[in-house]
From Swiss-Prot:
The gene is mfnB. GO terms for molecular function: carbon-carbon lyase activity. Keywords: Lyase, Schiff base. Belongs to the MfnB family. This is (5-formylfuran-3-yl)methyl phosphate synthase. It comes from Methanopyrus kandleri (strain AV19 / DSM 6324 / JCM 9639 / NBRC 100938).
């Protein structure tokens, strides 16, 4: 089965472009607040209103600190808006124990309040640049915390991509570990068009992009365009 393409718009117009281009998951984020920067609840709602029922919606809650209560409330907030996935960037957690505490709180918040939102634990391939936990530990943390998806992205958006920090073999090990724990796997990190067949063949369930779907490849100043999304979707086929 080919991976599902996740594209990250910042507003309604970009979301429509992503849908037209064939994105499977519309991922609401705010690049001005970081790699997994959180957008406003009303923006999430505006985007959800234009996404067809046969597509899914995810939302990031930020590159989060080691504050389990704060993060759990944020996850509960996006679950209440009605998204299919809540993505948590484990930015401020330096150890597996800290990450586990944060993600357990997130999973518990969603389940105890009766939502079926899937919880995504995201680590960073360039963790050494920001002092966060080893990304290779994320699948085990996600499984133990009863999350649904293990993800790896990049924290610093300076043009360097996932494979500048992890080899194809290491990414394959991440994918295999997550699958062995019964999790889905999402791969992201300034991925380019030419990376699509690689991440597909490594077994990713979800492939996340923003910059590659934007004009001039610029995730901050460029806008998502449907023809670029379509090329990425075709490259995953």
């Amino acid at each position: 089965m080919r991976p599902r393409l996740l594209v990250s718009p910042v507003n309604r117009d970009e979301a429509l472009e992503a849908v037209e281009g064939g994105a499977h998951i519309i991922d609401v984020k705010n690049p001005e607040e970081g790699s997994l920067g959180a957008n406003f609840p009303w923006v999430i709602r505006e985007i959800m209103e234009v996404v067809p029922e046969d597509r899914e919606v995810s939302a990031t809650v930020g590159d989060v600190p080691y504050k389990p209560g704060t993060v759990a409330q944020a996850v509960l907030g996006v679950a209440a808006v009605g998204v299919d996935y809540a993505k948590v960037g484990l930015y401020g957690t330096k150890t597996e124990e800290e990450a586990l505490e944060v993600m357990r709180a997130c999973s518990r918040a969603v389940r105890e309040f009766g939502y079926d939102t899937r919880v995504v634990a995201a680590g960073y391939a360039d963790a050494h640049r920001v002092g966060s936990l080893d990304p290779m530990s994320v699948p085990e943390v996600a499984a133990e915390a009863e999350c649904d998806v293990a993800m790896v992205d990049t924290a610093v958006k300076d043009g360097k991509r996932l494979f500048d920090f992890l080899s194809e073999e290491e990414v394959g090990e991440f994918v295999d570990s997550a699958h062995e724990h019964g999790l889905e796997v999402a791969l992201a990190g300034s991925l380019r068009h030419e990376d699509m067949p690689i991440v597909r063949d490594l077994g990713a369930d979800i492939v996340g992009v923003r910059g590659a779907a934007c004009e001039r490849g610029d995730r901050n100043r460029g806008a998502i365009r449907s023809h670029l999304v379509r090329k990425l979707a075709e490259a995953l086929a």
